[in-house]
């Protein structure tokens, strides 16, 4: 196995990733597979922060008849459910894990405190950041970019159900072209589906590379961290 390319990483997992092939709820076997890869990262000496989405439970935009702010807060609570599920999965493997939330709920998690989060990472604890930024109208992608900047992560590992960034939906178009490398500006100008524009701009301003890859292949998280050429790398230099 190659040596780690990064010392501190931010892993962004969509809620759908935790649902596996089900598309809704939890696939505990698949969540365990993700947790086993995270454990290997910790064993390699890599400090791991994670942000989880909530799309396997609730998608704010799907509640089109609801008040947007209320729908977004419901989505934030969904991320907390996912964070606790991932924490439990990791702790069953013996990985020390902390959940920090942007909305205080001290009975189940710590409030987000930057210095405490960084201290946990230095002590080889995985830190899962839940409830997004704590504000409506901001996605969990933006939360991942924000927390990555705050904890001074070397990279955002954007784990998706697609193995990289394409010029169009590869599930719909057989001639979809995959990119190996992109600049932030190209992503923004072409409207490519990586992160939303707020998150992408935040990464660009803070020079945080984004590695987009699929979870469909075993050990892809390990491959991403050890520098194997998988997925699509988005950075300031193409």
Curated annotation (Swiss-Prot):
GO terms for biological process: 'de novo' CTP biosynthetic process; UDP biosynthetic process. It catalyses: UMP + ATP = UDP + ADP. Residues 20-25 are annotated as: Involved in allosteric activation by GTP. It is found in: Cytoplasm. Its EC number is 2.7.4.22. Gene3D superfamilies: Acetylglutamate kinase-like. GO terms for molecular function: ATP binding; UMP kinase activity. HAMAP family: PyrH_B. This is Uridylate kinase. It comes from Clostridium botulinum (strain Hall / ATCC 3502 / NCTC 13319 / Type A). The gene is pyrH.
